[in-house]
């Protein structure tokens, strides 16, 4: 049975991914500091192949000891989004950059690393982005995640996924994401307010990530 270690596994994407992995026969360990609580993963505790470790990716020693023995490391732990990163810029860089360095340094060389990066790394682009499109992040979020991605790609057995803006229901629901916000407003307030009309975004359902 393959063993999967997920940093930030109690978050929006992680809480969606965990039950899918369990259903498909993986043993899953979530490593999370529960900064947004643990309600999104609590239903998994009844599964015999689910494990939880409360920890922070900035705690290098605890992180490294927890990573041992796993086949795949999925690194999702981060300060996510423009607004959250602006609230504490220094901490955002520590988590998104130094925290990622800590993850990479804890790998044993045989483990596969899957990194949850972001389309915010591209910045303003004319046309369709590809893997070869130069990165020009504009926000603190994009800059800190780009630094993290650079560290990840130094590791030979790694893949980085530059996610589009996610939407859809999750056990750890986020209403600050654009499509979720508009859906909530339409249902509860009976109207939506469209803002930043000059911006263009790509979207992906959280279950398609």
What are these model-predicted stretches?
Residues 57-94:
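NAD(P)H-binding glycine-rich loop region in Rossmannoid oxidoreductase-like domains
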Residues 1-72:
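N-terminal Rossmann/SDR dinucleotide-binding element
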Residues 7, 31, 73-77, 113-119, ...:
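SDR active-site strand-loop-helix element
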Residues 127, 138, 150-201, 206-208:
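NAD(P)-dependent short-chain dehydrogenase/reductase
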Residues 144:
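Active-site helix of classical SDR
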Residues 75, 101-140:
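Conserved Rossmann-fold NAD(P)-dependent oxidoreductase catalytic core, especially the SDR/UDP-sugar
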